[in-house]
């Protein structure tokens, strides 16, 4: 009926189950740790690979830059350092140009100030000159109003003495203001001198005739001497008439050539004066 209860005892199977459970837990932990180690190793390998790739690319880039510089040295650089250096150089050039332009502006402004000052001085000088010109014009007008009119100048002829012995070709020159009036005066002088010469010849012939007649009457000589005296008188009268005809012809020529120079008029008057004493001397000879 009722059986007594027996105590439970651990058998080998129980021990086996416990060991299996503990081993499974430890194996799971080992697997997790191995996975973590594998992941860390993978990450390290990837980083190393990226670094190696970067180094390779940098090396290739440097090689390509060297090759490009060797092929085309004027080719613009595209790296950051070259760009920065180029910009810095450009800024320096721009600053130098700005300084140069500032210096030029200063010099030009100084020159402009000097020119403005000179322009003002020239304006002042122009104003003073204008005032001086106005004053001089006023003085000139005043003098013209108060000035006495000048008497017109009359040209007088220069007298000269005719040389009878050793006639020279020298003719005195008289500078005159009005040559027409001088020519008219020379013609009048020539006509007056010729008229005086003819009057002198007539006055000299008449006393000679009277003297000859008186001498012929008082001498008491014959008719032969009277005839000789008459012939001499006729010859002298004929010579005087020829001289008068020459003088009248020369006067006509002078009247036709009124536009001739003063030297020709003087030479004609000299010729007339030279001829008239010769005729008188011829008449006075016995």
UniProtKB/Swiss-Prot annotation:
Expressed consitutively in roots, leaves, stems, and flowers. Keywords: DNA-binding, Nucleus, Transcription, Transcription regulation. It is found in: Nucleus. The keyword Coiled coil does not apply. SMART domains: HLH. GO terms for biological process: intracellular iron ion homeostasis. Residues 18-27, 183-198, 255-269 have a biased composition (Low complexity). Its main location: nucleus. CDD domains: bHLH_AtILR3_like (cd11446). Residues 44-94 form the bHLH domain. Residues 1-34, 182-202, 244-286 are annotated as: Disordered. The keyword Transcription regulation applies. One of its GO terms (cellular component) is cytoplasm. InterPro entries: bHLH11/121 (IPR044579), bHLH_dom (IPR011598), HLH_DNA-bd_sf (IPR036638). GO terms for molecular function: DNA binding; DNA-binding transcription factor activity; protein dimerization activity. Pfam families: bHLH_IRO3 (PF23177). Residues 270-279 have a biased composition (Polar residues). Homodimer. This is Transcription factor bHLH11.
